[in-house]
Amino acid sequence: ALCRHALSQNPGICLTTGTVNPVVFECNDSYLNDIRGLHIKEEHVLSALKNASQTFEEGSLGAGRGMRCHGLKGGIGSSSRMLDIAGHPYALGALVLANHGSLSDLTIAGRHIGPRAEELLNSGWASGYEQQQDKGSVIVVLATDVPLDSIQLRRVSRRAVAGLSRTGSNIGHSSGEIALCFSTANPITHDDPAPFRQNLQLNEAHIDLLFRAAAEATEEAVLSALFHARSLTGRDGHRAHALSEVLAALEEKETQQAQDQRMI
């Protein structure tokens, strides 16, 4: 589907320019989705490409439909950071497909809320809960307009793991973390006749700004996926509960406990 789309958008492919090498990532959603049914067809992919825009929904839609994150409903999340380098504004954005982590480890803004959430779900508050080990997959795509070379891009992409760890991910044995970083700076034309090319490149004395931005944006994107996701019942009655519902129930429970204490 991606090859067909690229060919339709660029008649010069394989004639005046190179071939198509699409990049496709994958997350296992078999807990909620009947993956043996192969329900996604080429027309669905082409429709998604046609409707792609700068604004998009987050949570449990598209590739995020069958995702679970920290034992709750996961999905698509995004975030960004603005950077000032030598008086010039730059940006770094993160797009995350969150399908990883265990509930007992979940941490939000430094608060380790996982055990309380797990206790609530195990108490029978909601049906269909099944514990999730720290496994699955997470895909992080980082985009920036800061001019970086391939080594610098690789270094920035590795800082996505710092953001994942802030939410409680310990990168379990069966968890596949994939992070890709690209820069929109230094465009390369396929028909440039010049024998040499001169590109801008960030002085690495400033690269810590990118490292921090990558970690912060990844952390926030994972949390955004969790907060935007809605509860879903999938195949065989498997259910993934939304973080928003769990937090509301925890708040109600703690309010009731506080009232009971005052009455005593």
PLM regions and their residue ranges:
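Alpha/propeptide regions of enzymes that mature by internal proteolysis
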Residues: A1-I264
